[in-house]
Swiss-Prot record:
GO terms for biological process: cyanate metabolic process. One of its GO terms (molecular function) is DNA binding. InterPro entries: Cyanase, Cyanate_lyase_C, Cyanate_lyase_C_sf, CYNS_N, Lambda_DNA-bd_dom_sf. This is Cyanate hydratase. NCBIfam families: cynS, PRK02866.1. Keywords: Lyase. The active site is at R96, E99, S122. Catalyzes the reaction of cyanate with bicarbonate to produce ammonia and carbon dioxide.
Length: 156
C-alpha cells in the first residue's frame, strides 16, 4: 500500500542519499530516468522529493543508485510537496523562476483568463520539458514548456 509522508524530513534525507549516489556513480538525471518509462522532469522532481514514483520506476531508479528496499519504498510514498518553506528562495536559479512569476504572473493570469475564462492551469495534470537551444547571438537559451490542463472554475 502506498504511504503518505507527514513531514518533509524523510524525503529530504532520501534526496541527499540520491544526490550523493548520483555523483558517486557519475550519472545524469537522463541516465537515471532511462528505463522508467517516465519523463526526465517527472522523475527528477520525484528524486528531489516532489512526487512519488510508481513501483516499477522506483525499482529501476533504486537499482541504478544502489538504494535499499526501504529507500525504494520511500520513493513511492506521497511527499509533502513544495520547496518554498523558507520564504523567498535564495538559490539563484530557483530565484529567477520566482522572479519570472513575480514579473509575469499577473500577465499569465490575465492571458489565461482572456483565452480560457475563469479557471486555473493544473500542476497535477501537467507536463514539463526543458531544452537547450543555440542562441543566434551566441551562447545558449533555455526553452521551458509548461503544459498544464485548463480547469475552469465551476460555480456552485
Amino acid at each position: 500500500m502506498i504511504q503518505t509522508q507527514a513531514t518533509r524530513t524523510a524525503r529530504q534525507e532520501l534526496t541527499e542519499v540520491i544526490i550523493l549516489a548520483k555523483a558517486r556513480k557519475d550519472l545524469s538525471f537522463a541516465q537515471i530516468v532511462d528505463g522508467t518509462g517516465l519523463s526526465e522532469a517527472f522523475v527528477t522532481a520525484a528524486l528531489l522529493g516532489q512526487h512519488p514514483l510508481p513501483e516499477s520506476a522506483a525499482k529501476v531508479v533504486g537499482d541504478k543508485l544502489d538504494l535499499d528496499a526501504d529507500q525504494v519504498a520511500l520513493l513511492q510514498s506521497m511527499p509533502v510537496r513544495g520547496s518554498f518553506f523558507d520564504g523567498v528562495p535564495s538559490d539563484p536559479t530557483i530565484y529567477r523562476f520566482y522572479e519570472m512569476m513575480s514579473v509575469y504572473g499577473t500577465t499569465l493570469k490575465a492571458l489565461v483568463h482572456e483565452k480560457f475564462g475563469d479557471g486555473i492551469i493544473s500542476a497535477i495534470n501537467f507536463k514539463l520539458d526543458i531544452k537547450k537551444v543555440e542562441d543566434p547571438d551566441g551562447g545558449h537559451r533555455a526553452v521551458i514548456t509548461l503544459d498544464g490542463k485548463y480547469l475552469p472554475t465551476k460555480p456552485f
